[in-house]
């Protein structure tokens, strides 16, 4: 009876895994035009935010200094005093467009992520029975394996998440999260996360192996340590 109910639960799990991508793609297409119109209207009413103005002004000053240096070299200071170089105007327009696209990207992805989280939370809340059946089926499948295979899978999972090369993977994960949310990369946060999170996770896994798994199957713990120390 449990195995018959496990198949719908597995399909439900696959649906839950694929749902965020489908929702993200659909809502990105649906919300993009609406958010773009709303943002452009808001921009026309309130002009540029302070941070946006400051960043563009800094870039403008940098370009102006470069342009002045170029004009001094070419000895065309009179032309510069009468009319600013066309290149600066083009660069300013490009900066405004790029900054506007960055803000649209942040708002769009943040809205999509909130909607995905709400939908997934609703599915988890309304489908507790399927999750309970799936959890019991996975536990039954795991307990029916012999201790050597169990130790192999545990060692594989621990090395994958907290092994020697796992730091690079966690760095890619947090960079993907930042990019998906539209946040500016912060190397300090990346370094702190990569240095601390695998250590915390490794401590939790060791606690689970020593205190929880040892009560269920002491022989499994012995095999696990024998393989890991080999």
Swiss-Prot record:
Chief localisation class: plastid
Signal peptide as annotated in the record: none
Catalyzed reaction equations: K(+)(in) + H(+)(out) = K(+)(out) + H(+)(in)
Any one Gene Ontology BP term: potassium ion transport
Keyword terms of this UniProt record: Antiport, Chloroplast, Hydrogen ion transport, Ion transport, Membrane, Plastid, Plastid inner membrane, Potassium, Potassium transport, Transmembrane, Transmembrane helix, Transport
UniProt GO cellular component terms: chloroplast inner membrane
InterPro entries assigned to the protein according to its UniProt record, in alphabetical order: CemA (IPR004282)
Keyword Membrane: yes
Membrane protein topology class: Multi-pass membrane protein
Keyword Nucleotide-binding annotated: no
UniProt GO MF annotations: antiporter activity; proton transmembrane transporter activity
Pfam family, one: CemA
Compartment(s): Plastid, Chloroplast inner membrane
Transmembrane segments annotated in the record for this chain: 7-27, 106-126, 145-165, 181-201
Family membership noted in the UniProt record: Belongs to the CemA family.
UniProt function note: Contributes to K(+)/H(+) antiport activity by supporting proton efflux to control proton extrusion and homeostasis in chloroplasts in a light-dependent manner to modulate photosynthesis. Prevents excessive induction of non-photochemical quenching (NPQ) under continuous-light conditions. Indirectly promotes efficient inorganic carbon uptake into chloroplasts.
Protein name per the record: Potassium/proton antiporter CemA
Native source species: Lolium perenne (Perennial ryegrass)
Gene: cemA
């Amino acid at each position: 009876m449990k195995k018959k109910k496990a198949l719908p639960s597995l399909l439900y799990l696959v649906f839950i895994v694929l749902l965020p991508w489908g929702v993200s793609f659909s809502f990105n297409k649906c919300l993009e035009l609406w958010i773009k119109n709303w943002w452009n209207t808001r921009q026309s009413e309130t002009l540029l935010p302070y941070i946006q103005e400051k960043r563009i002004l800094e870039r403008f000053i940098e370009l102006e200094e470069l342009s002045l240096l170029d004009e001094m070299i070419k000895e065309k200071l009179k032309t510069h005093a009468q009319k600013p170089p066309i290149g600066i105007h083009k660069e300013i327009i490009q900066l405004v467009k790029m900054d506007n696209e960055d803000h649209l990207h942040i708002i769009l992805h943040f809205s999509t992520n909130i909607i995905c989280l709400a939908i997934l939370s609703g599915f988890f809340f309304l489908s507790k029975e399927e999750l309970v059946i799936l959890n019991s089926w996975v536990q039954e499948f795991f307990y029916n394996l012999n201790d050597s295979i169990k130790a192999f899978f545990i060692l594989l999972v621990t090395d994958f998440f907290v092994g020697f090369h796992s730091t690079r993977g966690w760095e890619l994960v947090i960079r993907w999260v930042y990019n998906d949310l539209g946040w500016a990369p912060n190397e300090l946060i990346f370094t702190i996360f990569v240095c601390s999170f695998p250590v915390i996770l490794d401590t939790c896994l060791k606690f689970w192996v020593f205190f929880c798994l040892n009560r269920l199957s002491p022989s499994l713990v012995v095999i696990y340590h024998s393989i890991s120390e080999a």
